[in-house]
From Swiss-Prot:
SUPFAM superfamilies: Kazal-type serine protease inhibitors. Disulfide bonds join C35-C67, C45-C64, C112-C144, C122-C141, C130-C162. The keyword Disulfide bond applies. One of its GO terms (molecular function) is serine-type endopeptidase inhibitor activity. Residues 29-86, 106-162 form the Kazal-like domain. The keyword Nucleus does not apply. The gene is Spink10. The chain crosses the membrane at residues 6-26, 80-100. This is Serine protease inhibitor Kazal-type 10. Gene3D superfamilies: 3.30.60.30. Expressed in epydiymis, in the cauda and corpus. Also expressed in brain.
Amino acid sequence: MKLSSLWSNAFVINVAIALYAETAFLSAPKLKIDCRPYLDSNDKCTREYHPVCSTSGKTYCNKCTFCKALRLDTMSSSLLWIKITFILALVVPFYYGTTFAFSKEARRQPDCDKYRTFPNQCTREWNPVCGTNGFTYSNECVFCNAKIAAKEKIDYRHFGPC
């Protein structure tokens, strides 16, 4: 045989191996295991050794232990989502209750009539109100007192700083 034909045969074989190596050597047939017989939570698995290899690379001693582990893994991920949902259900209302307080209150204007009877007796709380004069008042009471003193020339723009 000529040397050139040996090299060409070797080249063809190497190309074939390179093209089909993944399917020929790496991928094993993926079997779908029916876990329905093992779904009852009271059943215990036997200790017989008929190994089942999972896609995660872990080997289980038989179908029953594989299905139990799969069910527990599915349950733990579902429990994780339940925990996340529960935490979000607790945290989100507190966060948005404080964050959107101004947008909820922006729909109603301060009732300045209740401050006419006791003028200039305001608390020092910080719940800012923006007036149409561009000034930020520390709270509704201070705003209403300024509005009454200015003979209603100042009007309410929105809750929050200007």
